C-alpha cells in the first residue's frame, strides 16, 4: 500500500477549493439508476469507490461518460441489465445503496454478507433489509449470501428507524420515490449528503418533504425524468485544510463552502482556540491563533466535543479535531457516540508523543501541547484517522511517515497535490 512521506514544520498558506463530497456522490450515483433518462452530475470526485460504481454500471450495460478533468459524469441506464448480471462492487460499504434501485429495476439483489467499507466497527445490514421488507421485498439467506427479491411493485410504508442511519435513510428514500402511495420515515438522518441525495431526486421529479429534518414524507411517482445536479463540496476537506492552517500557524482560505452547515463546526474550532472567519462562501484561518482550549464555566468538568448523528458535531470530523487538539494548550474530552472502534488508531497518534488517555471505547481525553517528535505510524482502514495522522506529522519538524495511508484516496482525490500547493512537503512513497 502507498505510504505518505512528510517533512513537517512548514506553515501552510494559500487557497483551496474542496472536491465534491464522497458521501453525497456515491448515493447520488446509485440513485441515478431510478430513471432511464439522461442524468448529468457535476463536482464528482475522482476516487476509487466512484471508479467501482462506474465499472459496475458499464458491466451491467449502462452508458457512462466520465470527464474526470471537468468532474462531470453523464449516465444513461436505459440498457441496464441487458449486458449480464455483474456482482455488486466489493470493498465498499456504499454497495448497500444499490438495494432499492436494483429492486426497482430488476427485482432482485444478490449480496455477499461481508459488505464493508472501513474499520470503524459493526456496520450492520439489518436496517437496510428491514426497510426493503417493509416495501415488499423477500429475503432468501444462505451461509454466504443474501438474496433480496420482489415480485410486484413496491408499496409505500411508514417506518420508525432504530437510529439515524445515513445509508438506511438514503435507501428508504430511493425505495419510496417510486413506490405506490405515500411513505413516511421517522428518525431519519439529515446530514448534508443525505440532503443532497433528496434534492437530486426532487430535481428528477420526486415528491419529498421534510428534507434536512428527522421526518421525511414521500409521495410516490410513476417515473423520474432526466436532470442535472451539482454535488456539494466536501465539508471533511474543508475542516481538514482549516485545521492544518491553524495547526501550522498559516493562512488558509477554503472557497465554495456551504457555510450554512458550519455553525456548530466553527464553534468547535473556537473551543480549541481557533477563530474561523466566515465570508459568505469562504472560510478562513489566519496566523496567530491562540490555540488555547476554552474552559467551561462549570469548573469541575472537562471541555468536550461530542460527535453523533447530524445535527450533532459530525462523527467523521472527530479525528481531525483530535489532531488539532494535540497542538492546542489544555485538556479536552472527545466523545464518539456512534462507533465502538472509532479510537482504535490512538496508539499510533501517541507515537508522535501526543498525550492521550483512553477512558473507554467511546471517550478519550487529549492533553495538548506536549513535545512531539517525528515518527513512523501505521494508518488504520479509516479515512479520516489516516488524514489526522498526517496532520499531526505536518506540524513536527523532521521526517515522518504514515504507512498504509491509501484509504485517504477513497475520499480525497488530489490530496497530496492540494497540500503541496499550500506549501507542505509531502509525497506518496
Task: Please report, for each region that a protein language model flagged, where it lies by residue.
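Short, structured segments at the rim of ligand-binding sites
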Residues: 1-429
